Every structure is written in C-alpha cells, then in structure tokens.
C-alpha cells in the first residue's frame, strides 16, 4: 500500500519563482512532509558584485517561512559547468544551436539533484514544471501540461520511466493564471514575480556579449547560395537557421533570413522570404535519442507519432526509425520550416511525451542542407 502523505517526504526544487512556490504550497496543503531546496548552478555575480541567485534564494526563504517548511541551498556549480555549460559552448563551436534547458534537466535537476533528494530520505522530488505524470496502468508516463501555452515536456524529453517514478509535478494540471491566483490568495512573496525568460546563466545580459567572453567570434561574409555578397556577419555562432533580425541587410522586397552556414569557409548564407524553400526540410538524423519507456516501438522497426522541433511549435506527423543505440532517422509527413541542428526533437502520441533527441543533420529531397 502507498504511504500516507504525512509519511511521504517530498523535496521541492525551488527557484524563487511563482511556479515552484505554488508546487511547495500545494504539497504542504496535501499533508506531505515537504522540504524546499534551492539549487545554485551558476555563479552570476556581476561586475558590481550583485548576484541574482542571492535575490532568488531570499525569495525561497520568504516563501518557505510563509508555508512553514524547512529550506536549504545546495551547490551544483561544478556539475553544471561540466555537464551543461561545456556542452553549450561545444555545440556553439560546432555551429549548432544548443538547448541547455534540456541538458540541465537531464544531468542536473533529475539526476544530480534527484540523487541528492533521495539521499535526504525523500520519496519524491517535485518541481514547478508544467507537465504531468500518469501512474494509472502500471507504467509511468509523462503527459503534457494541461496549460498548452506553458507545457514544458519539450524540455523534459530525456527523462526515463525510472526517474519519473520518483517525480511529482504538482502544478501540471493547472493553468498558469490559476497558479498566480493560488500564490496571490496565499499571500506568497513570489505571487507577482515575473517569470524568468531565456537561458538561466545569461539572464538579462546581452547574448552576444556573454558568448564572446567564452568563445572568440570570427566575423565573415554573408552571401546568397549563388555567392552574391550581402554584407558581413559577426560570427556564425550568433545566428540560427530561420533568423531574421540582426542581419542588417537593407533594400526593398521581402525580408532576409538565415538559410545556411558553412563552418569551414565561415560563410553565413542568407535569402529572402519567410517561406523560402531553403528553409524547409523533410528529414533529420537525431542523436542522444532516449525514450521514457523502453518498449515504445512494440517490436516494430518504425514508430509513427508526432514531433516538435522547437518549443511551443505545432506538432508535426513523423516516422521514427532507430539507426543505432541512441541514433534515429526522423522522416516528416510534410516539410517543416527552420529545423535547427542542436535543438531538441521531441516525440508525442496524443497527450503522452514519448521521449526525444538532438537534431543532428537536416535533409531535403535526399540532400543534406547547409545548416551547419
């Protein structure tokens, strides 16, 4: 028989934001033995000695005191640097556009942090993610968050059934507006705090300035695929496929977009038109492919499902075929725009998130595209 809530210890990963605050509050109200833990993953002290993590931790302390739960801080800076930040830099060096949130969830939050929580005698780790865990039929499934606009399964695609069996998502069945209401009704210190956006370790800083501190930029030519010179770029790492802003190409006609990169020659390829054929692909190869449930193919060679190629994008019908232990070929039913190497491809069957991988090479009509 399952343990009673009062005999069940839950560690809540608290960021100092409203979502994790409400997650902790709901668990406490349900009678669980709740501990709030703040993870420090990045030393973001700026040149004036100000560190946003300090402010966030102060908010965690306020909320935990309001709810009446103990709180701690734990430092994962070393693991974060090695597992997330180095990967982030390596991907940019390779001309790709990485997704550090996916790697942070895989290596830090639901690995290092989960292990830490279990070592404290926790039965579960809870977070403020908009996702749901379904334990109804003897299997543990991950379902999309009910708030379509906030669903975060895209970033959780690398979680395994084993990890999910130890995880709770208390706000996954709520709309964001309701989460804010609950925080307000309870008078939580974070009720009106704005959501953090962008990459956690960059924060409000300028992306180019931040990246240039770690990777030397190599400016080069911007050209059309026919070779026509269109200007200079600041460094290939600053541009992503389908990007429109920051190209600085004047003139009349349709807007210009990034349609390709040549890492060897350091050329950024550009062309006009949002629906430019050069921006569309019909197949990818993916690496680091992992599924929540091992038997997802059910003995078949191919898996028909839908996929997202970027966060908050519509689902696209695809067929997945494994080509190695963690490598796959993904064929699209219809061409998809601006599929970007380094980003996550995430697979779904209806409400269920099946797993995902990293977009590697991109193809159109059998030809590999100049996307890296």
Curated annotation (Swiss-Prot):
InterPro entries: MnmA-like, MnmA-like_C, MnmA-like_central, MnmA-like_central_sf, Rossmann-like_a/b/a_fold. The lineage of its organism: Bacteria, Bacillati, Bacillota, Bacilli, Bacillales. Belongs to the MnmA/TRMU family. GO terms for biological process: tRNA wobble position uridine thiolation. GO terms for molecular function: ATP binding; tRNA binding; tRNA-uridine 2-sulfurtransferase activity. This is tRNA-specific 2-thiouridylase MnmA. It is found in: Cytoplasm. Its main location: cytoplasm. It comes from Bacillus licheniformis (strain ATCC 14580 / DSM 13 / JCM 2505 / CCUG 7422 / NBRC 12200 / NCIMB 9375 / NCTC 10341 / NRRL NRS-1264 / Gibson 46). Its EC number is 2.8.1.13.
